[in-house]
């Protein structure tokens, strides 16, 4: 039984599915997708549960969410292993994901009060009050790269605000989704407040097409995000929050410490085997001897990276990609760029056929025309050389995406220029592109999102504002508007 609907675990009536470890092919999870009728049922019970949940005092909702945080802490080792085995990422990195999930609780509570909550301003004749109300029934679509943390970033603030939810994990990480929902069950969520439907494209389409949804919160690829945007077009009454990918530039302008710059680049481009939406995809390196030395050192150190199993000892820096098919897609993208005229500096290599273990690749594309403006979700770094900083900014902005952008430089003035001219939601200076703070908004412009950033701003798309002018009693104003006459007329 792999679906959780109205507080009950039930068997899906859709397609049979199984999930294997992307390196060992060990079967980890088996179950059936939710069919359209079960998806509709999940929405119906969420609708029925909404009025009571929304009317709970905030403290009551907060108590359940904090109980969930305590359960995450108590089961950290178990959830770490589930995430690591299912995604292929090393144990150390999966542990950091669970830690981020735990920290998200306190941050979301603070954000609720700071961004939404209730605020009152006293007036001479009463008060002006700002309140926030939940939307209703929301669908949450989760990604596979952070199958616990990223859905958590939607689910927690949405529940705190008083919404009820239908959660569809990625079909590539059903085990993590199920494990997390079991912790929510133990936290004491009332039946119907949060529902789990497993499945792939058909389940997702059935969910996103429901008329009774009040909104959809999505993290994933731009192609799927655009499809959802088209599907919900003409429905302005529904909230749609899209957190999509990027073709992110990292500018290497002035290298005071070569190894530090190489380390920053490795963290930006290859952590999580390149499967973070903020990963550097385009490396812009200034022409000259300093840039040459930096690139040579980068190729040297990156060439030593050996992906490994989730439980290897010692632990590898990177594990496998989410699937062997994902690794093959990266290889095809590299060959395509070679065919366009790219010069390979470090060839990616499959460690073992049939697995998702893939070494990083680096290819120079300076002067190459018609390079696809796409997010290759894996450890492939494209290099361009530039002559001056204005050219670097032009290259950085030469994309339909706008998620993250970074600069390595000792010159603060250059960073100030980048802040003014960069088209990206995250702009870092001498910090990895993959570094982001939950106390700040997380999101991008262009094809990277629809101006609904998550993290600290997630509270904004989980509730709508209600403004009120209030007075405990009704009185006639001392001064009337022109043309109004309330004088008593004598009877004739």
UniProtKB/Swiss-Prot annotation:
Enzyme class: oxidoreductase
Molecular function (Gene Ontology), one example: succinylglutamate-semialdehyde dehydrogenase activity
GO biological process: arginine catabolic process to glutamate; arginine catabolic process to succinate
Keywords: Arginine metabolism, NAD, Oxidoreductase
Catalytic activity: N-succinyl-L-glutamate 5-semialdehyde + NAD(+) + H2O = N-succinyl-L-glutamate + NADH + 2 H(+)
Positions of the catalytic residues: 243, 277
Matches recorded under PROSITE patterns: ALDEHYDE_DEHYDR_CYS (PS00070), ALDEHYDE_DEHYDR_GLU (PS00687)
EC number from the UniProt entry: 1.2.1.71
Listed InterPro entries: Ald_DH/histidinol_DH (IPR016161), Ald_DH_C (IPR016163), Ald_DH_CS_CYS (IPR016160), Ald_DH_CS_GLU (IPR029510), Ald_DH_N (IPR016162), Aldehyde_DH_dom (IPR015590), SuccinylGlu_semiald_DH_AstD (IPR017649)
HAMAP family to which the protein is assigned, alphabetical: Aldedh_AstD
Function: Catalyzes the NAD-dependent reduction of succinylglutamate semialdehyde into succinylglutamate.
Similarity comment: family membership: Belongs to the aldehyde dehydrogenase family. AstD subfamily.
Protein name: N-succinylglutamate 5-semialdehyde dehydrogenase
Organism of origin: Salmonella gallinarum (strain 287/91 / NCTC 13346)
């Amino acid at each position: 039984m792999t679906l959780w609907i109205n507080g009950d675990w039930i068997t899906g009536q859709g397609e049979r599915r199984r999930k294997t470890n992307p390196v060992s092919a060990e079967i980890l999870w088996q179950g059936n997708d939710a069919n359209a009728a079960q998806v509709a049922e999940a929405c119906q019970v969420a609708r029925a549960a909404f009025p009571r949940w929304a009317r709970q005092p905030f403290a009551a909702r907060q108590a359940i969410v904090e109980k969930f945080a305590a359960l995450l802490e108590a089961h950290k080792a178990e959830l770490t292993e589930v995430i690591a085995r299912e995604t292929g990422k090393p144990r150390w990195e999966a542990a950091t994901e669970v830690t981020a999930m735990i920290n998200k609780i306190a941050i979301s509570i603070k954000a609720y009060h700071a961004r939404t909550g209730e605020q009152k301003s006293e007036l001479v004749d009463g008060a002006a009050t700002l309140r926030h109300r939940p939307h209703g029934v929301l669908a949450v679509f989760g990604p596979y790269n952070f199958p616990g943390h990223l859905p958590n970033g939607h689910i927690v603030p949405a529940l705190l605000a008083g919404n009820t939810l239908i959660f569809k994990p990625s079909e590539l990480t059903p085990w993590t989704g199920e494990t997390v929902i079991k912790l929510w069950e133990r936290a004491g969520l009332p039946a119907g407040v949060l529902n789990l439907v497993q499945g792939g494209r058909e389940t997702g389409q059935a969910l996103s097409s429901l008329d009774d949804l009040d909104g959809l919160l999505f993290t994933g690829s731009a192609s799927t995000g655009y499809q959802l945007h088209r599907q919900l077009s003409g429905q302005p009454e529904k909230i749609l929050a899209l957190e999509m990918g990027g073709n992110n530039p990292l500018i290497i302008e002035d290298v005071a410490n070569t190894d530090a710059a190489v380390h920053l680049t490795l963290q930006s481009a290859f952590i999580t085997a390149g499967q973070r939406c903020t990963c550097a995809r385009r490396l812009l390196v200034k022409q000259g001897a300093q840039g040459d030395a930096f690139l040579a050192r980068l190729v040297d150190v990156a060439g030593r990276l050996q992906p490994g199993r989730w439980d290897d000892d010692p632990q590898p820096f990177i594990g496998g990609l989410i699937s062997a098919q994902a690794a093959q897609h990266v290889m095809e993208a590299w060959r395509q760029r070679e065919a366009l005229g790219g010069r390979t500096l470090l060839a990616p290599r499959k460690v073992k056929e049939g697995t998702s273990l893939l070494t990083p690749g680096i290819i120079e594309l300076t002067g190459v025309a018609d390079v696809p403006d796409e997010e290759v979700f894996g450890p492939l770094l494209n290099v361009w050389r530039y002559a001056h900083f204005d050219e670097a900014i032009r290259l950085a902005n030469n994309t339909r995406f706008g998620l993250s952008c970074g600069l390595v430089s000792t010159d603060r003035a250059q960073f100030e220029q980048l802040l003014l001219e960069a088209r990206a939601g995250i702009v870092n200076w001498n910090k990895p592109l993959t570094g982001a703070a939950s106390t700040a908004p997380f999101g991008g412009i262009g094809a990277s999102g629809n101006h609904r950033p998550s993290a600290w701003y997630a509270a904004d798309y989980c509730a709508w504002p209600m403004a009120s002018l209030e007075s405990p009693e009704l009185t006639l104003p001392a001064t009337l508007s022109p043309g109004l006459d309330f004088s008593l007329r004598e009877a004739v």
